[in-house]
């Protein structure tokens, strides 16, 4: 065994784990609410009714008046549950803001980047925890699994998918931030132009590769 191949493992502190638990609990509620909203829309569509276009946060307010009479016994409890989940998500949002103000003020600096909000900045700070353990900033991209796999045969070097190592929640949040930066509402910036140059190369999944590249730059 060559000891030089080994690397030390740094465990997260109990306080960091507790703060991450708040973010992961919120993420579970957000995904649950999305599934409930999609289910309600699907049930109504089967009877020829469409709910108005709106955000998931406002769905419980705008949907009730459009529920078909035949579906009210089935959808009314779900709409009440969506409302309760929305209230709980807002409570988690306030808790996240309190954690940032009390323990992680550096997140406010991270939020200066367009598309990066409280949840993404705090998740990044908690997952990285100690930036000094990385020798260079490029190592962070590999740490959260946003660098391509390698498979060199000598004759060819195929382009493979990213490794998807590390924390999946942080990786998803960074990709969402990158999607906003590259989207129609994202203002002009170095990150946006960087992603547009990659997308302009064309090829299969060019837009998807550009979002991943911008997310890696964010990290």
Could you say what each language-model-derived stretch is?
Residues 1-11, 17, 58-67, 154-165, ...:
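Short alpha-helix plus adjacent loop in nuclease-associated cores
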Residues 3-7, 36-37, 89, 129-133, ...:
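Short helix-capping/linker segments at secondary-structure and domain boundaries
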Residues 202-219:
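Charged substrate- and nucleic-acid-binding regions of tRNA-handling and nucleotidyl-transfer enzymes
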């Amino acid at each position: 065994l060559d000891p030089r191949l080994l690397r030390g493992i740094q465990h997260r502190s109990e306080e960091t784990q507790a703060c991450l638990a708040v973010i992961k609990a919120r993420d579970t509620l957000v995904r649950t609410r999305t599934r409930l909203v999609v289910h309600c829309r699907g049930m109504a569509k089967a009877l020829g009714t469409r709910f108005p276009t709106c955000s998931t946060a406002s769905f419980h307010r705008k949907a009730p008046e459009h529920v078909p009479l035949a579906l009210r016994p089935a959808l009314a409890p779900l709409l009440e549950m969506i409302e309760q989940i929305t209230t709980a998500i807002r409570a988690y949002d306030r808790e996240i803001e309190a954690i940032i103000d009390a323990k992680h003020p550096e997140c406010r600096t991270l939020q200066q980047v367009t598309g990066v909000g409280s949840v993404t900045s705090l998740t990044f700070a908690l997952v990285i925890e100690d930036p000094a353990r990385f020798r260079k900033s490029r190592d962070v991209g590999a740490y959260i699994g946003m660098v391509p796999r390698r498979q060199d045969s000598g004759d060819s070097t195929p382009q493979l998918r990213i490794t998807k190592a590390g924390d999946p929640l942080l990786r998803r949040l960074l990709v969402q931030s990158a999607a906003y930066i590259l989207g129609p509402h994202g203002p002009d910036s170095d990150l946006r132009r960087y992603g547009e140059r990659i997308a302009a190369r064309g090829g299969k999944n060019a837009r998807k590769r550009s979002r991943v590249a911008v997310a890696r730059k964010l990290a």
